[in-house]
From Swiss-Prot:
CDD domains: DHDPR_N. InterPro entries: DapB_C, DapB_N, DapB_N_CS, DHDPR_bac, NAD(P)-bd_dom_sf. It comes from Anaeromyxobacter dehalogenans (strain 2CP-C). GO terms for biological process: diaminopimelate biosynthetic process; lysine biosynthetic process via diaminopimelate. SUPFAM superfamilies: Glyceraldehyde-3-phosphate dehydrogenase-like, C-terminal domain (SSF55347), NAD(P)-binding Rossmann-fold domains (SSF51735). Belongs to the DapB family. Pathway: Amino-acid biosynthesis; L-lysine biosynthesis via DAP pathway; (S)-tetrahydrodipicolinate from L-aspartate: step 4/4. This is 4-hydroxy-tetrahydrodipicolinate reductase. The gene is dapB. GO terms for cellular component: cytosol. It is an enzyme of class 1 (oxidoreductase). NADP(+) binds at R35. It catalyses: (S)-2,3,4,5-tetrahydrodipicolinate + NAD(+) + H2O = (2S,4S)-4-hydroxy-2,3,4,5-tetrahydrodipicolinate + NADH + H(+); (S)-2,3,4,5-tetrahydrodipicolinate + NADP(+) + H2O = (2S,4S)-4-hydroxy-2,3,4,5-tetrahydrodipicolinate + NADPH + H(+).
């Protein structure tokens, strides 16, 4: 039985993950963590998730939940995820990160922790989205430079980071498939008189509103035709399901940074 610690256990994603982990054969919830001062501290993680008690009380420090654990599932913030990665590295516990908004410095700190333990770091745990990454890669290779690439994403009004990590990754996948450096190709906003669109540019546009769980569309715009690849999330459950799948796959792997393509076997694993 793989023992799983869930951070942000009282949040929207955390409660979904607790429910999915307890329902997944071979996985069990061994710990639950919330921020210091949260009213969830001391409460049962199973009850908070709307189910039967698990006998697992929510604590305010990840280090308290790590003894005996096999893997941590973390959907918090990139700042908290860095601290959690460092704690997991010190304790020798594998880590699945679904947080977004990572800066290059934060990613570097996670990579440093991954020198000691295996880490799955993915901007989107959905199986469908990770299939879309591969579809975009293939489309970009086939369509080539004759098609302009644009990415549009929309999320609920409460999402704090923009653009989404998934949108950025979609742009990166297209850029890499076209032989372009993402740092040079990706354009995150347009305003004013900019002149003609540079042919090497990949635009990423952000919309926020209502209760939209998440929607991403990649446009390949050519002369006389347009190809669109879209993923629409209608529930957070598919993110939790992917995270549980990653948690079952990760323990026992060599230290390093993995992503959902590795988990799903979409390319040769490490």
């Amino acid at each position: 039985m793989t023992k799983v610690v869930v951070t942000g256990a009282a949040g929207r994603m955390g409660t979904q993950i607790v429910r999915l982990v307890r329902a997944t054969p071979g996985l069990s919830v061994s710990g639950a963590v919330e921020r210091a001062g949260s009213p969830a501290i001391g409460k049962d993680a199973g009850t908070l998730a709307g189910g039967e008690p698990l006998g697992v009380a929510v604590v305010d420090d990840l280090a308290k939940a790590l003894p005996g654990a096999d893997v941590v599932i973390d959907f918090t913030s990139h700042e908290a995820s860095v601290r959690h990665a460092q704690a997991c590295a010190a304790a020798g516990v594998a880590l699945v990160i679904g947080s977004t908004g990572f800066t290059p410095d934060a990613k570097a700190k996670v990579a440093e922790a991954a020198r000691k333990v295996p880490v799955v770091l993915s901007p989107n745990m959905s199986v469908g989205v990770n299939v879309v990454f591969e579809l975009v890669r293939q489309a970009a290779r086939v369509l080539g430079d004759a098609y302009d690439v644009e990415v549009v994403e929309i999320h609920h009004k409460h999402k704090r980071d923009a653009p989404s990590g998934t949108a950025v990754r979609l742009g990166e996948v297209a850029a890499e498939a076209l032989g372009r450096a993402p740092a040079d190709a990706l354009a995150y906003s347009r305003h004013g008189i900019l002149g003609e669109r540079p042919p090497w540019q990949i635009g990423i546009q952000t919309l926020r509103g209502g209760d939209v769980v998440g929607e991403h569309t990649v446009f390949f715009c050519g002369e006389g035709e347009r190809v669109e690849i879209t993923h629409r999330a209608t529930s957070r459950e598919q993110f939790a399901r992917g995270a549980a799948r990653a948690a079952a796959w990760l323990p026992g792997k060599a230290p390093g940074v993995y992503d959902m393509a590795d988990v799903l076997g979409l390319r040769g694993g490490k």
